[in-house]
């Protein structure tokens, strides 16, 4: 125990110099810095004082230091123990050198005891460290360090107080140890090995973060000396080694920058450390502190960057990249969902290349390279071995990878392009197939419709002929026969058919109007009005069709014909807007050509009228006066018809003179016109009215012939429907629609052809019938004029009948109007003239029969027999029934009765009777009409494509 030993262990001067930084003391001490201990005694006392100060400082420091050092207490304790042990022996020499060796021995004894005490405490530390209060732990550690040094100092410095040293050193050591013990008790739970020190935390309990995180972790002084036995598990920072983990994120306020040069300084000293060996083993001298390769973190970053780069390159290179991103195809989807395995997908291509390249690259062991590349490239699995293996080869690898990636990308792009092309091709083919199928469908439908139309046309022709014959007979018989007439008319329809057939062949009707407008220029020999009538007819037809479209969505065909009509007839479109409009339009178109005055008056009023009419009709059924009665009361029309009938009746039999007919018509029109004026604007002049009536009638008739035939029927069947229904009933009502449409193209043509005159008469008659003129129809003169007047009023009525119909069945009125319009359209060329002039006489003769027949045939067209009856009923009863019972279908009987010009009452009664009887038959007829309408629609559709 010579002083020689003491100098090596003597910490005095180092401590004096580096009390703030004890780690340096340790380092100096360990490095064997020797300092004379001659004044050690005095120094010792000073040092002890200093050490006390230091202890306080160090304690404060530790308090401010991180708690995270929990693991260090052990290392420090160990270190301090080691120091004390080594110092213990050395201490005595110091003391000896100073004065008293006994003191030294006592000091040694004391030191030994203190050491044992310390060891005990340390042992406790090892076993019981609980992470209770990191700060105290840190303090404790530093305190321990300080204590160890102080103890050493005390051991060595005791001589300064010669006699007291033992006591003093022991006393001081004890206080130090007491402090340490206190600290250790605090620390007892300090965790070693960097465990989390919240073992004693209750669930959810959190330590005050200010304690742990605010305080930077101090560097480990013992590690700096190379003494730290804790290695990686040390709580304190070992600059190059354990400062990389989670702890590195905590800001360090230590004197040494964690990665700064100072930390590196101590390493050379490490080997000198007796304790260095184990430390080195544990630490594995921070394997080149940062293997030049990358940490997982860096690798992830790099991978992300690469992916980004690749993506941008792809965007630049692939024009369709954006589209591809959005196009979802199975192939691409698979790729999307398969992303995690994408890295391996190309491995097959990659591996062989790797093997091929192996010779060129020293590190390219195909297997390991493959592995590295795979893991590195994919960045899927973190293969940390890569760090060590990859450092060099990685760059070659990268280049090779880049090439490979480029190739793969190109290949992918090509594949994608191929796929896109395939997809487009397939789509195009699919579309083509669909087109082909659609065309086939269209063809099939067209053919079916054509076939159906042909069949229906035949039936319609027969029905029409039968209806015409019956109508004629019943017209002759007058209303009474007429009510029964439906059968006779049905029987007669053959005549009609023959008539229609003959005219059809001769007439321009042969041309099937895509809109199913009946062209009956030949029908009415008087062609003067025919152009306007034709126009009106078209318009009316269009309006009927359009109206039926608007009023009935059920009739698709009507939409076709309607739209077609609307195209061809500007009015049609308005017409289609609604029955009221359609009435207005029919009035307009009829009026236009014939007498605008009438047109204007009916038009405006009818429009409101159609909606009003229901009221008016009910009220106005009384106003049977001429057109007003008819118009406003197409349902009430029978009463107007009776006045007309009276006039017509006056003209007498069918053979009534054309002039008479015209006069009667004019009178009727005038008569009606007042009502019309009431209902409408009342802007029809007698002649204007008659003309307007004629033209309107022609138009209505023309629609009527096509529409009206079905319309008359429809009117009876449609009585329940609104005017628009009637109007459109021809087109829309199953029966009327069928008759007006499916038959209409054929019927219109056939009817127009067969008996365009008849149709005109019939339609006029129908108008008359609705206006109670069908009976007059029987009387040729009155019938003709009445028909015309009725027709004219009906054109006006198209508005008003709608009114009346609206009251009873707007549709019925409309139907009547449409019928009138049909007549008008059929007559446009001839019928209006016929109605107005000699043709009216002919019409008068034919009109009753034809009107009845037309109505019936219209009905028959859709549902021949019911419709004929309806047609008849609809004609007269439509008005009376409309007046009296808007809902009751125009009774067939009533229609016939109504036909009786003079029997408005009869008509009304008949209408009532018919209404009752009709309701059932009407329902049936309506159903039939519906079917007919659909059929007609189908036919029309089939026809329209062919025609158009």
Curated annotation (Swiss-Prot):
GO molecular function terms attached to this record: zinc ion binding
Keywords: Acetylation, Coiled coil, Isopeptide bond, Metal-binding, Methylation, Nucleus, Phosphoprotein, Ubl conjugation, Zinc, Zinc-finger
Subcellular location: Nucleus
Modified residues (N-acetylmethionine): 1
Compositionally skewed regions (Pro residues) per UniProt: 603-612
Ranges annotated as C3H1-type zinc finger: 215-241
Covalent link Glycyl lysine isopeptide (Lys-Gly) (interchain with G-Cter in SUMO2), residues: 506, 618, 657, 813, 903
Phosphoserine: modified positions: 6, 33, 45, 58, 64, 71, 75, 80, 92, 106, 114, 169, 483, 528, 530, 532, 838, 847, 863, 888, 891
N6-acetyllysine: residues bearing it: 810
GO CC terms, sorted: nucleus
Biased composition (Acidic residues): 15-25, 95-105, 121-132, 139-154, 187-203
Coiled-coil stretches: 395-460, 916-945
Compositional bias segments (type: Polar residues): 888-898
The protein, known as: Zinc finger CCCH domain-containing protein 18
Organism lineage string: Eukaryota, Metazoa, Chordata, Craniata, Vertebrata
């Amino acid at each position: 125990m010579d002083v020689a030993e003491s100098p090596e262990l003597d910490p005095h001067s180092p401590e004096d110099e580096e009390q703030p930084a004890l780690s340096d003391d340790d380092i100096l001490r360990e490095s064997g810095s020797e300092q004379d201990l001659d004044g050690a005694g005095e120094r010792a006392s000073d040092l002890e004082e200093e050490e006390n100060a230091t202890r306080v400082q160090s304690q404060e420091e530790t308090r401010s230091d991180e708690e995270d050092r929990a693991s260090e207490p052990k290392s420090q304790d160990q270190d301090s123990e080691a120091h004390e042990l080594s110092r213990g022996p050395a201490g005595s020499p110091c003391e000896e050198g100073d004065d008293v060796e006994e003191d030294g021995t006592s000091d040694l004894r004391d030191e030994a005891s203190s050491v044992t005490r310390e060891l005990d405490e340390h042992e406790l530390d090892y076993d019981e460290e609980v992470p209770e209060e990191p700060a105290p732990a840190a303090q404790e550690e530093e305190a321990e360090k300080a204590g160890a040094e102080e103890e050493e100092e005390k051991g060595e410095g005791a001589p300064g107080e010669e006699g007291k040293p033992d006591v003093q050193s022991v006393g001081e050591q004890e206080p130090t140890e007491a402090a340490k013990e206190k600290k250790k008790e605090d620390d007892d739970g300090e965790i070693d090995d960097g465990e989390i020190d919240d073992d004693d935390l209750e669930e959810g309990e959190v330590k005050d973060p200010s304690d742990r995180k605010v305080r930077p972790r101090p560097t480990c002084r013992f590690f700096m000396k190379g003494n730290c036995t804790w290695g990686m598990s040390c709580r304190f920072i070992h600059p190059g080694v354990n400062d990389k983990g989670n702890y590195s994120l905590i800001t360090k306020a230590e004197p040494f920058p964690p990665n700064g040069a100072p930390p590196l300084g101590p390493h050379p000293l490490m080997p000198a450390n007796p304790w260095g060996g184990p430390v080195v083993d544990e630490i594995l001298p921070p394997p080149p502190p940062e293997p030049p390769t990358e940490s997982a973190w860096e690798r992830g970053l790099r991978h992300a960057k690469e992916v980004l780069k690749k993506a941008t390159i792809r965007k630049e290179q692939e024009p369709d990249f954006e589209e591809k991103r959005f196009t979802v195809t199975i192939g691409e989807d698979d790729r999307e969902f398969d992303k995690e395995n994408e890295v391996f997908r190309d491995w097959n291509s990659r591996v062989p290349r790797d093997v091929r390249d192996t010779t060129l690259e020293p590190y390219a062991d195909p297997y390991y390279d493959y592995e590295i590349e795979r893991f590195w490239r994919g960045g899927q699995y973190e293969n940390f071995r890569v760090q060590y293996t990859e450092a060099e080869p990685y760059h070659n690898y990268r280049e090779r990878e880049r090439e490979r990636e480029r190739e793969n990308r190109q290949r992918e792009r090509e594949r994608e392009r191929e796929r896109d092309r395939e997809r487009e091709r397939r789509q195009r083919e699919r579309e083509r197939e669909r087109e082909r199928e659609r065309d086939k469908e269209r063809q099939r439908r067209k053919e079916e419709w054509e076939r159906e139309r042909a069949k229906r046309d035949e039936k319609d022709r027969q029905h029409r002929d039968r209806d015409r014959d019956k109508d004629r007979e019943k017209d002759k018989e007058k209303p009474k026969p007429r009510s029964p007439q439906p059968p006779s008319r049905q029987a007669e329809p053959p005549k009609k058919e023959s008539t229609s057939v003959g005219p059809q062949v001769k007439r321009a009707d042969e041309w099937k109007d895509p809109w199913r407008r009946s062209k009956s220029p030949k029908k009415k020999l008087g062609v003067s009005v025919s152009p306007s009538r034709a126009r009106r007819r078209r318009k009316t037809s269009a309006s009927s069709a359009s109206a039926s479209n608007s009023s009935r969505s059920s009739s698709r065909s009507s939409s076709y014909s309607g739209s077609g009509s609307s195209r061809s007839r500007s009015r049609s479109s308005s017409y289609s807007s609604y029955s009221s409009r359609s009435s207005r339009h029919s009035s307009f178109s009829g009026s236009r050509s014939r007498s605008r005055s009438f047109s204007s008056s009916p038009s405006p009023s009818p429009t409101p009228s159609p909606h009003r009419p229901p009221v008016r009709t009910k009220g106005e059924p009384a106003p049977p006066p001429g057109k007003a009665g008819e118009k406003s009361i197409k349902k009430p029309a029978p009463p107007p018809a009776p006045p007309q009938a009276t006039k017509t009746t006056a003209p007498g039999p069918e053979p009534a003179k054309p002039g008479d007919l015209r006069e009667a018509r004019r009178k009727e029109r005038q008569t009606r016109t007042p009502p019309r004026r009431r209902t409408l604007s009342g802007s029809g002049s007698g002649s204007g009215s008659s003309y307007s009536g004629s033209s309107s009638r022609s138009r209505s008739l023309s629609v009527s012939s096509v529409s009206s035939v079905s319309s008359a029927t429809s009117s009876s069947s449609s009585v329940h429907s609104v005017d628009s229904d009637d109007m459109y009933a021809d087109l829309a009502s199953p029966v009327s629609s069928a008759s007006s449409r499916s038959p209409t193209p054929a019927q219109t043509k056939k009817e127009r052809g067969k008996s365009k005159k008849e149709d005109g008469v019939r339609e006029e008659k129908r108008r008359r019938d609705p206006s109670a003129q069908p009976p007059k129809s029987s009387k040729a003169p009155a019938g003709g004029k009445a028909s015309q007047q009725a027709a004219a009023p009906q054109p006006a009525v198209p508005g008003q009948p709608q009114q009346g119909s609206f009251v009873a069945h707007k549709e019925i009125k409309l139907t009547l109007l449409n019928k009138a319009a049909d007549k008008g359209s059929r007559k446009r060329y001839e019928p209006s003239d016929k109605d107005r002039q000699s043709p009216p006489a002919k019409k008068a003769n034919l009109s009753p029969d034809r009107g009845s027949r037309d109505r019936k045939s219209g009905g028959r067209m859709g549902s021949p027999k019911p419709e004929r009856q309806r047609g008849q009923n609809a004609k007269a009863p439509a008005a009376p029934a409309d007046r009296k019972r808007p809902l009751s279908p125009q009774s067939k009987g009533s229609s016939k009765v109504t036909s009786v010009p003079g029997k408005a009452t009869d008509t009304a009664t008949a209408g009532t009777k018919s209404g009752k009887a009709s309701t059932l038959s009407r329902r049936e007829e309506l159903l039939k009409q519906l079917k007919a309408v659909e059929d007609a629609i189908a036919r029309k559709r089939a026809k329209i494509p062919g025609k158009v």
